[in-house]
């Protein structure tokens, strides 16, 4: 009984595989793909630019750069004073 049911299923699956891709699933032509590359690159560039601007603006708005600058300045002055006292 199993063999009787599996043979028609196997034939249908084999027919579907051998008929190839449907027209909507077929690969697009190379010329149309190459024609869309500049648009895709421009879209990618614009997206990247927007994200970079947002990241830079976020960094400018935060207080991390000011804290870092102050820490380096204080550390530099401490080292400078220690060197003055050591070599005086």
Curated annotation (Swiss-Prot):
Pfam family name, one: ApoC-I
Subcellular location: Secreted
Keywords of this entry: Lipid transport, Secreted, Signal, Transport, VLDL
Primary localization class, coarse: secreted
GO cellular component, one term: very-low-density lipoprotein particle
Gene Ontology MF term list: fatty acid binding; phospholipase inhibitor activity
Designated name of the protein: Apolipoprotein C-I
Function comment: Inhibitor of lipoprotein binding to the low density lipoprotein (LDL) receptor, LDL receptor-related protein, and very low density lipoprotein (VLDL) receptor. Associates with high density lipoproteins (HDL) and the triacylglycerol-rich lipoproteins in the plasma and makes up about 10% of the protein of the VLDL and 2% of that of HDL. Appears to interfere directly with fatty acid uptake and is also the major plasma inhibitor of cholesteryl ester transfer protein (CETP). Binds free fatty acids and reduces their intracellular esterification.
Family per record: Belongs to the apolipoprotein C1 family.
Annotated InterPro entries: ApoC-1_sf, ApoC-I
Signal peptide, first to last residue: 1-26
Source organism of the structure: Leptonychotes weddellii
Example GO BP: negative regulation of lipid catabolic process
């Amino acid at each position: 009984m199993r063999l009787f049911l599996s043979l028609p299923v196997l034939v249908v699956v084999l027919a579907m595989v051998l008929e190839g891709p449907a027209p909507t699933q077929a690969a697009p032509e190379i010329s149309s793909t190459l024609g869309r590359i500049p648009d895709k690159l421009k879209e990618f560039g614009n997206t990247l630019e927007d994200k970079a601007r947002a990241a830079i603006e976020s960094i400018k708005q935060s207080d991390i750069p000011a804290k870092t600058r102050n820490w380096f300045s204080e550390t530099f002055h401490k080292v400078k004073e220690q060197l003055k006292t050591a070599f005086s």
